[in-house]
Amino acid sequence: MALNSINTNSGALIALQNLNTTSSELNNVQQRISTGKKIGSAKDNGAIWATAKNQSATANSINAVKDSLQRGQSTIDVALAAGDTITDLLGKMKEKALAASDTSLSTASFNALKADFDSLRDQVTKAATNAKFNGVSIADGTTTKLSFLANSDGSAFTVTAKTLTLGGLGLTTTSSFTTAAAAKTMIGTIDTALQTATNKLASLGTSSTGLDTHLTFVGKLQDSLDAGVGNLMDADLAKESARLQSLQTKQQLGVQALSIANSSSSAILSLFR
């Protein structure tokens, strides 16, 4: 190949190729800086892009898991609140039964205590029946267990229902007394109901703690997945900024090199003047 040719300027061609390469790299860096992503699409790195997309899908699906677990929390919280009310009512029922067991009471006083007892009993039914969250209850005896999403694979966190109705506590809608002796017997019955209620509430409390712990774990898992996706996809902006400055300088030098290479043709022409 001729060293000096007006038909083919090899120096200019090489300079142009280098400038095009630099410009392409510069465009890529500018895109990474503007988007904040080092992997913008499958064409950038198919394997990493696919992995990141799968991880991102898993992280996003955990939102449904968290929603389900939070419903579980609320359902248990409502049952625990109802249970707290019910144990208070049972305590008051015991108080009325104990007072009514006093054989020295007048008939009017006894009847007043019985009426109070019956009213408190009926309030237990109302508290248990209304212990619903979003129409669902684990305290009214309508279900034996409830399952909530535990992970993105569809596995379940199961909570065993605890019936806090009169029947679930060993009482009936007609539990009462008509004599002082019957009132004395009722004291023991209420004590048993109280023990049953507190045992069931303790069990629900354990379930609530377990659900809270799992919800915390799921939240941390989602954060870890999001961080992993970020590590795979996000650009190092400090590094890209330094790279941008370097390529901009390289581009300017490339333009100068191309200008110098193009001037060689003019130099050859001057030889013939």
Curated annotation (Swiss-Prot):
Gene Ontology MF terms in the entry: structural molecule activity
InterPro entries membership: Flagellin (IPR001492), Flagellin_C (IPR046358), Flagellin_N (IPR001029)
Keyword Secreted part of the UniProt annotation: yes
One Pfam family recorded for the sequence: Flagellin_C
First-listed, main subcellular location of the protein, grouped into a coarse class: secreted
Domain of life: Bacteria
Keywords, alphabetical: Bacterial flagellum, Secreted
Record's subcellular location: Secreted; Bacterial flagellum
GO cellular component terms, semicolon-separated: bacterial-type flagellum; extracellular region
Statement: the UniProt record of this protein carries the keyword Lyase: no
Gene3D superfamilies listed in its UniProt record: f41 fragment of flagellin, N-terminal domain (1.20.1330.10)
Subunit and partners: In C.crescentus, the flagellar filament is composed of multiple flagellins of 29 kDa; 27 kDa and 25 kDa.
Family of the protein in this entry: Belongs to the bacterial flagellin family.
PANTHER family listed in its UniProt record: FLAGELLIN
Function recorded in the entry: Flagellin is the subunit protein which polymerizes to form the filaments of bacterial flagella.
Protein name: Flagellin FljO
Organism: Caulobacter vibrioides (strain ATCC 19089 / CIP 103742 / CB 15) (Caulobacter crescentus)
